[in-house]
Amino acid sequence: MTTSTPLEPTARTTVNRGRNRSVADRDQLHAFLADALVAHIGVVVAEDGQSHPVVLPAAFAIDLDGPDPDGTLYVHGSVAAGWLRAAQDATVCVTVTELDGLVAGRSAFHHSMNYRSAVVIGPARVVDDPGERQHALDLVVDHMIPGRSATLRASTRKELAATAVLAVPLREASMKARAGGPVDEPEDVDAGVWGGHIPLHRVAGEPVTGEDANGPAPADVVRRAASL
């Protein structure tokens, strides 16, 4: 298994604001990425002779033993997506955020949010190797529901031909996190206005069996719903 190295800030990933919220432990980054569900990828695309940035949500997964030093982040996409073609061999930015609470300060200035957030910057690579691509797609499925890929039929050639995977090295990354209540000015505290925070939690409902499904939800789905 890959031995993780500390997060080493680069000119592109150095945290300049809220440095006290910066996370230096790469293992914490890995744990956060394993928990989060949605990534946003930013890339510059060209249309009608003009370039502009786009940021799009995507399913993702990480492989700490992947082909890149410090692991690989895989982003799920479609071969028909223009942003994915534009990302090939380009530098992209992938962000992942989980909102953990709303912070009510005693002034508008000190209202905030509790969160965990990661930024990964690096050269993107469209995965062409069939073995790596299938492995990455299995990881994406298992990131949603652990163990699910082993219960599914093999993907058809048509399905694989329509599906693309983008690989981004995990080496150049940063993470920030905030927790707890507001940090208010003493005079605002003395004024008597309420301050505090509202914790937010991700909660899953009971699995809903499809009308054409046979039997109840399988164990992997039930376990996943219970763990969210």
Language-model segments: which ranges?
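Catalytic micro-motifs at enzyme active sites that drive phosphoryl/nucleotidyl and oxygen chemistry
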Residues: V43-V44, G49, W83, G105-H110, ...
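A general structural signal for short secondary-structure junctions and capping/turn motifs
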Residues: H30-F32, L84-A86, R157-L160, L166
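An N-terminal domain-cap segment
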Residues: P6-V75
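A structural signal for short, well-ordered beta-strand segments
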Residues: F60, G122-A124, L166, L170
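A generic structural signal for short beta-strands and their flanking turns/coil linkers
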Residues: L37, L56, P69-G71, Q88-V92, ...
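C-terminal edge-of-domain segments
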Residues: M1-R12, D128, E132-L228
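Short, structured beta-strand-loop surface elements
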Residues: V79-L139
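Short hydrophobic-aromatic micro-motifs
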Residues: L73-H76, V94-V96, A118-V120, L166-A167, ...
